[in-house]
Amino acid sequence: MNPSQILENLKKELSENEYENYLSNLKFNEKQSKADLLVFNAPNELMAKFIQTKYGKKIAHFYEVQSGNKAIINIQAQSAKQSNKSTKIDIAHIKAQSTILNPSFTFESFVVGDSNKYAYGACKAIAHKDKLGKLYNPIFVYGPTGLGKTHLLQAVGNASLEMGKKVIYATSENFINDFTSNLKNGSLDKFHEKYRNCDVLLIDDVQFLGKTDKIQEEFFFIFNEIKNNDGQIIMTSDNPPNMLKGITERLKSRFAHGIIADITPPQLDTKIAIIRKKCEFNDINLSNDIINYIATSLGDNIREIEGIIISLNAYATILGQEITLELAKSVMKDHIKEKKENITIDDILSLVCKEFNIKPSDVKSNKKTQNIVTARRIVIYLARALTALTMPQLANYFEMKDHTAISHNVKKITEMIENDASLKAKIEELKNKILVKSQS
């Protein structure tokens, strides 16, 4: 049996939208395939990883059932050479699909914490339970940039596609450009058909719709049409509806008519979990020291954190060396916020001692009393995260024999953080106090 035919036959097992968005993009690679190995090319690395994980076993099973032969399925990103052979029609198709959902943005890959669990719960509920759509409609998710709003929005889209629903995802910019283009071409009917006749409408950064009254009027009618047809609407924004500038009151009223859920900056434990999830997805192995350093040193923008992880892996691969804490510090030095340059270890020591009611001289001594040892380790941990001091410099500050003693203390406090939720919260609180003080 021709392996390409397997994909065609799989159409019967999947919804039309699911097949068109994912498996229809695969091309059988006959040159690299063997009797027991079937290789398929996906348009990019992201799509390849997603299809391999989600559909690899299904394709293998389907092939075995229909052909009687077993084979390993390998989904890979097509090479640059193969990409260059794309026709103009292919390129036009890619441009037309510029708002396609990111297949890696799923509920399973979203890390849930106190900062986002309400928004996550609401979105997951309506994605899997149609009856809740009438109650939770629209859903309005707001919060600062880079905290996972787009991930959550597209997770709803991907789950809805699997259920065979017609999904439209667009940023406000996409929506405005789409409207403007169709208006110039005299094809507004096409625009209306696209946006009004969908089961799920996902609008990212809805705050930017406030550019013209005409755009808002169009969105108002689309919004009403979808709701009247029992369609689901989910939007994201940087602020809640009542704080949106330039948006008409009637739109604000409709935005606020369903569920309003905020996403706030993640706590330390959630940031650590996010970093681990990103490492797992990108097949990158980082030590606990490095993970904790990234979590405590960077801000809350998840995209920035993922960028650092990928940069670390690139540095290590190109230079042919292991990813160490020192390499992480070197790579991250330009990303760490400038406000941290104002933080000294004396500031950290003073605050920690005040919190634990301990003398600074005791923390800097070699006393082994448990509360003093814990305070000392917290000072070292925060100094590693918030200052540019090296381990030898810290060893000199605490009058320790050498940097290995500092490394030992970092390892111990990291283990304590992982096993003690209250300690995690306390260190996060201390860190925030130090950062706030450095800005004053």
Curated annotation (Swiss-Prot):
Signal peptide interval: none
Stretch list, region Domain III, AAA+ region: 100-316
Region named Domain IV, binds dsDNA: 317-440
GO cellular-component term (any): plasma membrane
Cell compartment(s), UniProt: Cytoplasm
Binding site for ATP: G146, G148, K149, T150
Pfam families tied to this protein: Bac_DnaA, Bac_DnaA_C, DnaA_N
Keywords (A to Z) from UniProt: ATP-binding, Cytoplasm, DNA replication, DNA-binding, Lipid-binding, Nucleotide-binding
InterPro entries, per the entry: AAA+_ATPase (IPR003593), Chromosome_initiator_DnaA (IPR001957), Chromosome_initiator_DnaA-like (IPR020591), Chromosome_initiator_DnaA_CS (IPR018312), DnaA_C (IPR013159), DnaA_dom (IPR013317), DnaA_N_dom (IPR024633), DnaA_N_sf (IPR038454)
Residues covered by region (Domain I, interacts with DnaA modulators): 1-74
Disulfide bonds: none
SMART domains: AAA, Bac_DnaA_C
Region (Domain II): 74-99
UniProt-listed GO biological process terms: DNA replication initiation; regulation of DNA replication
Domain of life: Bacteria
GO molecular function: ATP binding; ATP hydrolysis activity; DNA replication origin binding; lipid binding
Function: Plays an essential role in the initiation and regulation of chromosomal replication. ATP-DnaA binds to the origin of replication (oriC) to initiate formation of the DNA replication initiation complex once per cell cycle. Binds the DnaA box (a 9 base pair repeat at the origin) and separates the double-stranded (ds)DNA. Forms a right-handed helical filament on oriC DNA; dsDNA binds to the exterior of the filament while single-stranded (ss)DNA is stabiized in the filament's interior.
PANTHER family, per database record: CHROMOSOMAL REPLICATION INITIATOR PROTEIN DNAA
HAMAP family: DnaA_bact
Recorded family membership: Belongs to the DnaA family.
Comment block on domains: Domain I is involved in oligomerization and binding regulators, domain II is flexibile and of varying length in different bacteria, domain III forms the AAA+ region, while domain IV binds dsDNA.
Subunit structure: Oligomerizes as a right-handed, spiral filament on DNA at oriC.
Protein name: Chromosomal replication initiator protein DnaA
The organism of origin for this protein: Campylobacter jejuni subsp. jejuni serotype O:2 (strain ATCC 700819 / NCTC 11168)
Phylogenetic classification of the source organism: Bacteria, Pseudomonadati, Campylobacterota, Epsilonproteobacteria, Campylobacterales
Gene that this polypeptide is encoded by: dnaA
